[in-house]
Structure formats: structure tokens, C-alpha cells
Amino acid sequence: MMPAKLQLDVLRTLQSSARHGTQTLKNSNFLERFHKDRIVFCLPFFPALFFVPVQKVLQHLCLRFTQVAPYFIIQLFDLPSRHAENLAPLLASCRIQYTNCFSSSSNGQVPSIISLYLRVDLSPFYAKKFQIPYRVPMIWLDVFQVFFVFLVISQHSLHS
């Protein structure tokens, strides 16, 4: 079981990330996932390929969650395969698993757990952190994310 202090540290980190990504996490939703020993990030990278250096974003996430590696498996969804291959050692070092929602996973099914949906791909926070021009209107981010979630649910329905 994760120590209580570490639980609070992780919760604060996630809440901070969520605020920067314009989405607030509820304590109850997050704490439910402690019993699963799993944190899942659903990052819609497909609209972000030309806007965000994926490697820098992932390195930032890895650094923030290295301390929870003994307690959690952290999954990233829909990471372009070329980035996944290049970052395999980095992801493995933090027990971060990569799953592509648009191809068959190891067990032939699209994972159904999407517990934490952080808007970190094109958020103003990451744009500022990595000196990326933030030119995408927020309305389009919402459209992309709704579309992405719809695709994930559709893919999961097809496989079940």
C-alpha cells in the first residue's frame, strides 16, 4: 500500500498538472485508483504531433512520477509508434506502459480504463514550459478531445 504522505504528494502533483491543463481532478476519483495500483493517462497525441515535442513532455511526466513507480503502472495511450520506440528505455525505467488505442494491444483488446484525462498535450502550460507558440484556439482542443474519447470508446466497443 502506498504511504499516506506519498499519496498526498502524488495527488497534489496530479491536481497541479490538471489545473495547468484546464481540468481539475476530484480527490475521490483519484483515490479510487489507488486500489487498482494503476494510473492511466489518456493523452490525445494525434492532434499534437506538429505542435508539441512529445519527448520533452514525456520526460517531464516521467520525472514527476518516478517516485511512484514501485506502486503504480502508468500508461500512456495513443503515443505515435515512432516516439514510443525512441522512448522505450525512458518509459521502461519508470514502469510507464504504452498502448496504442488504434491498433490491437497485447491482449487484442483496447484498454477500458481511462481514469485520468489530463489535457497536457497542447495546454498553455506546456506551450510556455517548452517555448512553443500556443496558436490553437481552445474550442478546437475541445473538439479534438471529444473526438478522441469517442474513438477510444468506439474501438473498445468493437473489440468487446
From Swiss-Prot:
GO terms for cellular component: membrane. It is a multi-pass membrane protein. This is Putative UPF0479 protein YHR219C-A. The keyword Transmembrane helix applies. It comes from Saccharomyces cerevisiae (strain ATCC 204508 / S288c) (Baker's yeast). Belongs to the UPF0479 family. Keywords: Membrane, Transmembrane, Transmembrane helix. Its main location: membrane. It is found in: Membrane. It comes from the Eukaryota. Completely overlaps YHR219W. The keyword Cell inner membrane does not apply. The chain crosses the membrane at residues 39-59, 136-156.
